[in-house]
UniProtKB/Swiss-Prot annotation:
Gene3D superfamilies: Ribosomal protein S10 domain (3.30.70.600). This is Small ribosomal subunit protein uS10. Part of the 30S ribosomal subunit. HAMAP family: Ribosomal_uS10 (MF_00508). Keywords: Ribonucleoprotein, Ribosomal protein. Involved in the binding of tRNA to the ribosomes. PROSITE patterns: RIBOSOMAL_S10 (PS00361). Belongs to the universal ribosomal protein uS10 family. GO terms for cellular component: ribonucleoprotein complex; ribosome. It comes from the Bacteria. The lineage of its organism: Bacteria, Pseudomonadati, Pseudomonadota, Gammaproteobacteria, Oceanospirillales. It comes from Marinomonas sp. (strain MWYL1). One of its GO terms (biological process) is translation. The keyword Ribosomal protein applies.
Length: 103
């Protein structure tokens, strides 16, 4: 496994949650002897929604809502068998989406 690279992409709505999960992954990988690049913050996606709060006319009465999707990328350059086993057993927070790819 010395020539492979593991890329981990994380997505979450709460930046504190994604930062804690990223730090937990980095600590686990470094503890098992792997080299880590990142975390690299990717652009935050902001989705805005405008809702009319008036039941009939009055177009000036509106509420605006926004949801932000925070993203991070980690590269584990030299994964060992211990690194892969430790990452598989790692229990992350419920609000974080994890996507793992080998390359």
């Amino acid at each position: 496994m010395q020539s492979q690279k593991i890329r981990i992409r994380l997505k979450a709505f709460d930046h504190r949650l994604i930062d804690a999960s990223t730090q937990e992954i980095v600590d686990t990988a470094k503890r098992t002897g792997a080299q880590v690049r990142g975390p690299i913050p990717l652009p935050t996606r902001k989705e805005r929604y405008t809702v009319l709060i008036s039941p009939h006319v009055n177009k000036d009465a509106r509420d605006q809502y926004e949801i932000r999707t925070h993203k991070r990328v980690l590269d584990i350059v030299e994964p060992t068998e211990k690194t892969v086993d430790a990452l598989m057993k790692l229990d992350l927070a419920a609000g974080v989406e994890v996507q793992i790819s080998l390359g």
